[in-house]
C-alpha cells in the first residue's frame, strides 16, 4: 500500500501534526481563534514591511521624505503603508485578547507556553516601538527620545547605556539606522519564538473553556477548526482593510505629519494607543526610577501569574467572584489607556495613580485571595 505522503514526508509531517491531524478539544470557542489570527498578522506585517523597506531610506534627512514619496509615487504605496501601520494595531488587539483568554481560562498553567508568550509580547512591543520611530515625524523623534531616556534612570550605568543605544549624545542618524536594522530583524525573531511557543503548546495540547482534561474527546484540527479559523481570518482582514481604506489615520497622531524637529517639543508626547496603559502607569509615579520600575513591572507581572494561581479549578468559567475581578481588571486597563492619552493635570493624575495601584493590587493580592476564598466556598 502507498505511504501517505502527508504523514510520512519529514517536512509535511510537521505541518500535518500542527495544522491537519492535530488533536483538538471539541469545545474550544471563538476565543481560541486569536493564536492563528496573530500568525496571520505576523505574515501580513512581514510582507507589507518588506515592500515598505524596499522604498524606505534610513537617514534622518531622507526618512520622512521617503515615506511621503512612498505614499505619493509608489504603486499602491499608500495602501501598503496604511495596512502596515494599522496592521500593528490589529496585532496588539489580537495579542491582548489572546492574553486575556489565557488569563480567564487558566491557560497560563502551561507554564512554558505562557512564558514564551510573554517573551513574544515583549518582543512585539520592542518591534512596534522601533518601527514607530522610522517615519521620523515629530512624535517618532520625541517618543524615541523620551522612552530611550528612561534607561538613564538605571543607577550607575544608565547614562552610558543610553548614549550607547543612541550612538551619540542625542537621538540622531545612528539611532535611526540601528532602529531600522532592529525593526527588520525582530519580526523574524518573533516568527522563531512563535514556533517555540507552538512546540510547547503541542506538548500539552490546547486548554478548553471548562479547564478540564479533554483527551477523551478530541477532534482533528482540519476540517473543524481550519474552517472556523478561516472565518476569523476573513473578519480580521475585512476590519483591517476597512480601517486602512476608510480611516487610515484614526489611530495615529497628527503630530507625526510634521517632520522631526529637535528644537520644538510637541505639547503632548504620547505613544500609540497600545502602549498607553503602560505609559499611564509610568507617569503615575512622580519619581523617574520608580516610574521605570512600575512600567517594567506592568508587563513583567505576567511572568508571575502562574505562581499566583490559588484556585483548585483551572478556568474561571465556574468562579463568579474571579470573573467579577477579571472584568474589573479589564475596565481598569481601559481607564489606564484613557488616562495615558490625557494631559498631566488634575483630575487625570489622581485617576491614573488610583488605576495603577488597582492594577497591581488586583493581580498580586485580590486574585490569589479570591481564588482561595472560592475553594473554601465550594468546599474544595
UniProtKB/Swiss-Prot annotation:
CDD domains, alphabetized: cytochrome_b_C, Cytochrome_b_N
Annotated residues for binding of heme b b562: 84, 183
Gene Ontology molecular function: metal ion binding; ubiquinol-cytochrome-c reductase activity
Annotated signal sequence range: none
Cellular compartments annotated: Mitochondrion inner membrane
Chain sites annotated for binding a ubiquinone: 202
GO biological process: mitochondrial electron transport, ubiquinol to cytochrome c
Major place of residence: mitochondrion
Binding sites annotated in the UniProt record for heme b b566: 98, 197
One term under GO cellular component: respiratory chain complex III
PROSITE patterns in alphabetical order: CYTB_CTER, CYTB_NTER
Entry superkingdom: Eukaryota
Membrane topology according to the record: Multi-pass membrane protein
Cofactor: heme b
InterPro entries: Cyt_b/b6_C (IPR005798), Cyt_b/b6_C_sf (IPR036150), Cyt_b/b6_N (IPR005797), Cytb/b6-like_sf (IPR027387), Cytochrome_b (IPR030689), Cytochrome_b_C_euk/bac (IPR048260), Cytochrome_b_N_euk/bac (IPR048259), Di-haem_cyt_TM (IPR016174)
Cofactor note: Binds 2 heme b groups non-covalently.
Transmembrane regions listed in the UniProt entry: 34-54, 78-99, 114-134, 179-199, 227-247, 289-309, 321-341, 348-368
Keywords: Electron transport, Heme, Iron, Membrane, Metal-binding, Mitochondrion, Mitochondrion inner membrane, Respiratory chain, Transmembrane, Transmembrane helix, Transport, Ubiquinone
Pfam families: Cytochrom_B_C (PF00032), Cytochrome_B (PF00033)
Family: Belongs to the cytochrome b family.
Role noted for this protein: Component of the ubiquinol-cytochrome c reductase complex (complex III or cytochrome b-c1 complex) that is part of the mitochondrial respiratory chain. The b-c1 complex mediates electron transfer from ubiquinol to cytochrome c. Contributes to the generation of a proton gradient across the mitochondrial membrane that is then used for ATP synthesis.
Remarks, miscellaneous: Heme 1 (or BL or b562) is low-potential and absorbs at about 562 nm, and heme 2 (or BH or b566) is high-potential and absorbs at about 566 nm.
Subunit structure comment from the entry: The cytochrome bc1 complex contains 11 subunits: 3 respiratory subunits (MT-CYB, CYC1 and UQCRFS1), 2 core proteins (UQCRC1 and UQCRC2) and 6 low-molecular weight proteins (UQCRH/QCR6, UQCRB/QCR7, UQCRQ/QCR8, UQCR10/QCR9, UQCR11/QCR10 and a cleavage product of UQCRFS1). This cytochrome bc1 complex then forms a dimer.
Protein name (database record): Cytochrome b
Species in which this protein is naturally found: Paradisaea rubra (Red bird of paradise)
Organism classification: Eukaryota, Metazoa, Chordata, Craniata, Vertebrata
Gene from which this protein is expressed: MT-CYB
Amino acid at each position: 500500500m502507498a505511504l501517505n505522503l502527508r504523514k510520512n514526508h519529514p517536512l509535511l509531517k510537521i505541518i500535518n501534526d500542527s495544522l491537519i491531524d492535530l488533536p483538538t478539544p471539541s469545545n474550544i470557542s471563538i476565543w481560541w481563534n486569536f493564536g492563528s489570527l496573530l500568525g496571520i498578522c505576523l505574515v501580513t506585517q512581514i510582507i507589507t514591511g518588506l515592500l515598505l523597506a524596499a522604498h524606505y531610506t534610513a537617514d534622518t534627512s531622507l526618512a520622512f521624505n521617503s515615506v511621503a514619496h512612498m505614499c505619493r509615487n509608489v504603486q499602491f504605496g499608500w495602501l501598503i503603508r496604511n495596512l502596515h501601520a494599522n496592521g500593528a494595531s490589529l496585532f496588539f488587539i489580537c495579542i491582548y485578547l489572546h492574553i486575556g483568554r489565557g488569563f480567564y481560562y487558566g491557560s497560563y498553567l502551561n507554564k512554558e507556553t505562557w512564558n514564551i508568550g510573554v517573551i513574544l509580547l515583549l518582543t512585539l512591543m520592542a518591534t512596534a516601538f522601533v518601527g514607530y520611530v522610522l517615519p521620523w515625524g515629530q512624535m517618532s523623534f520625541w517618543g524615541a527620545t523620551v522612552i530611550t531616556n528612561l534607561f538613564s534612570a538605571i543607577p550607575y550605568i544608565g547614562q552610558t547605556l543610553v548614549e550607547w543605544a543612541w550612538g551619540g549624545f542625542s537621538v540622531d542618524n545612528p539611532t535611526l539606522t540601528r532602529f531600522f536594522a532592529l525593526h527588520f530583524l525582530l519580526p523574524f525573531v518573533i516568527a522563531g519564538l512563535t514556533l517555540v511557543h507552538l512546540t510547547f503548546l503541542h506538548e500539552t495540547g490546547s486548554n478548553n473553556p471548562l479547564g478540564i482534561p479533554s483527551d477523551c474527546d478530541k477532534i482533528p484540527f482540519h476540517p473543524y477548526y481550519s474552517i472556523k479559523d478561516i472565518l476569523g481570518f476573513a473578519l480580521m482582514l475585512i476590519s483591517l482593510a476597512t480601517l486602512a481604506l476608510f480611516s487610515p489615520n484614526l489611530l495615529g497622531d497628527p503630530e507625526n505629519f510634521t517632520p522631526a524637529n529637535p528644537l520644538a517639543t510637541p505639547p503632548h508626547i504620547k505613544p500609540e494607543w497600545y502602549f498607553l496603559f503602560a505609559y499611564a502607569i509610568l507617569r503615575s509615579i512622580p519619581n523617574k526610577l520608580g516610574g521605570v520600575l512600575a512600567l517594567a513591572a506592568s508587563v513583567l507581572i505576567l511572568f508571575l501569574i502562574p505562581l499566583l494561581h490559588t484556585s483548585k479549578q483551572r478556568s474561571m468559567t465556574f468562579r463568579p467572584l474571579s470573573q467579577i475581578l477579571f472584568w474589573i481588571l479589564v475596565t481598569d486597563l481601559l481607564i489606564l489607556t484613557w488616562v495615558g492619552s490625557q494631559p498631566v493635570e488634575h483630575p487625570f493624575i489622581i485617576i491614573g495613580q488610583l488605576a495603577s495601584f488597582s492594577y497591581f493590587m488586583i493581580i498580586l493580592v485580590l486574585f490569589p485571595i479570591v481564588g482561595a476564598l472560592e475553594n473554601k466556598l465550594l468546599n474544595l
